[in-house]
């Protein structure tokens, strides 16, 4: 699902929404289809450049997101992380590889939270978490 608002002809935004499985437990038998959550990112763009708000959790959805961004024909300059939950920043590595001109930014408390959320356990499950050498505080 995508939602667009283009009231300002110089600045545009669009939501990119995808469902993913969740860690919901204790669902009654036969109701397993209810164990999902929605992830949403926002792309804001002008004439040439774009800013992305948050990322996705997994590689498949992040690849789909990167394809969607490329289709806009703008240069992704910034990825802003709103908070340190894995489903908002685990796609950062793939996006920074795909868009080498982009920089990741977040408030210092968000960076600290992200750092705490990337223990060895997560790395074993999903691989490298983020391009921390390119992460900048705002």
Predicted regions and their residues:
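Short linear motifs at secondary-structure transitions and domain/linker junctions
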Residues: 16-21, 26-29, 54-55, 78-82, ...
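Pre-active-site segment of Zn-dependent metallo-hydrolases
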Residues: 24-38, 48-78
């Amino acid at each position: 699902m995508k939602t667009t608002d283009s009231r300002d002809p110089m600045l545009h935004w669009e939501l990119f929404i995808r469902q993913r499985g969740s860690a919901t437990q204790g669902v009654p038998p036969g109701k397993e289809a209810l164990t999902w959550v929605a992830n949403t990112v926002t792309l804001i763009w002008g004439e040439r450049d774009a800013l992305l708000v948050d990322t996705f959790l997994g590689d498949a959805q992040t690849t789909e997101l990167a394809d969607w961004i490329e289709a806009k024909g703008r240069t992704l300059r910034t990825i802003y992380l709103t908070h340190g939950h894995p489903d908002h920043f685990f796609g950062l590595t793939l996006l920074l590889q795909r868009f080498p001109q982009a920089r990741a930014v977040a408030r210092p408390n968000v960076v600290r939270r992200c750092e705490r959320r990337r223990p060895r356990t997560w790395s074993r499950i999903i691989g490298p978490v983020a391009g921390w050498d390119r992460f900048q505080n705002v």
